[in-house]
């Protein structure tokens, strides 16, 4: 089972404050573990324009049609001071890894320098921090009914309003997560 380019959808019983009602986009999953970015937990009072200001990046030439007031996500509990940018191709940046045909993750400053200009990727999600699982840990959490999984959907990843992503991700597999009981049993 490889869950790269899939969503992890927190089950209603998962009460960890960081992962409660979260949708995690899995960037890498292999025999050594998994790494992902939470895509529906906005950081309070932090937008993309705020990140650019802190890093003293001024979009040149600025395209006023491109909004920089999108929320920055809490990507996970690890390395919360590091930026991770999920975006659509191209992956012409210094530190980019292609996750799927339509999704790239970049950690280098050069992608930030394109934000707000015509050179920015068409779809962008900026996060601080990431989530990871050791070898076998994610698989055990799946057996413990902590998560649902669904193939990733770019519309949910980039365009669905943040507050609706948890429910919409579950709908990908035909589940209305808001009607599920708090604890699912094993069959």
Curated annotation (Swiss-Prot):
InterPro entries: AlgH-like. It comes from the Bacteria. One of its GO terms (cellular component) is cytosol. Pfam families: DUF179. Belongs to the UPF0301 (AlgH) family. This is UPF0301 protein YqgE. It comes from Salmonella typhimurium (strain LT2 / SGSC1412 / ATCC 700720). The gene is yqgE.
